[in-house]
């Protein structure tokens, strides 16, 4: 367990990818190669029609099916187990996008100001996940509302949230109110 989990938690949120379009895209991209090789194996072994100009052997197609199956299962497990976790404790803001990154802690001392912000994941950051765009870095998996942090060094970080008011209020407990803007 992470050390900060022994502290009192002021805010906690878990978000998962919920966009239907993105889910369909990931599922299709993961399963298409598998279906492609299954179709090729069917053509070659059942219909006795060579699959392609330089066809693989049936054994080669079976190996391709096995590799495609492993790939599809891996991609789908990663996608459906992915989650953005955000904690606020007295030691800072703790964020991770599981299973792609460990918890990253942002100290309150380094935050110049913060605010609730609507954003476009695609236009502002090029999509969802761990992103870097013209507006800075972002951790987002769903929705279009987040907490925009401006650090004293000028860096920006947006953390997507479905609970912007709760996030903001928890953050307000630890940051200097004179430098914070809603």
Ranges and model annotations:
Residues 1-59, 166:
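N-terminal membrane-targeting/pre-transmembrane regions
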Residues 5-7, 133-182:
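A membrane-cytosol interface segment of integral membrane proteins
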Residues 14-16, 95-158:
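Non-transmembrane, membrane-adjacent beta-strand/coil modules in membrane-associated proteins
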Residues 46-58, 70-77, 107-122:
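A broad, low-specificity signal for short, low-complexity segments enriched in glycine/proline
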Residues 48, 74, 128-129, 160:
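Glycine-centered small-residue hotspots that permit tight backbone geometry or close packing
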Residues 67-79, 129-130, 136-141:
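Short, solvent-exposed secondary-structure boundary motifs
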Residues 70-113:
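Conserved beta-hairpin
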């Amino acid at each position: 367990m992470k050390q900060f989990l022994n502290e009192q938690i002021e805010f906690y949120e878990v978000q998962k990818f919920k966009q239907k379009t993105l889910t369909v895209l990931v599922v299709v991209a993961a399963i298409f190669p598998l279906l492609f090789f299954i179709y090729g194996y069917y053509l070659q072994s059942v219909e006795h029609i060579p699959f392609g100009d330089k066809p693989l052997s049936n054994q080669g197609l079976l190996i391709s099916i096995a590799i495609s199956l492993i790939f599809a299962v891996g991609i789908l497990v990663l996608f459906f187990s992915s989650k953005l976790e955000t904690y606020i404790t007295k030691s800072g803001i703790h964020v991770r996008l599981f299973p792609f990154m460990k918890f990253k802690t942002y100290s309150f001392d380094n935050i110049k100001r913060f605010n609730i912000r609507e954003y476009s994941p695609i236009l502002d950051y090029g999509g969802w996940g761990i992103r870097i765009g013209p507006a800075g870095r972002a951790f987002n998996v769903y929705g279009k509302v987040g907490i925009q942090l401006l650090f004293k060094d000028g860096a920006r970080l947006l953390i997507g949230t479905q609970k912007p008011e709760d996030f903001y209020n928890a953050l307000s407990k630890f940051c200097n109110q004179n430098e914070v803007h809603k």
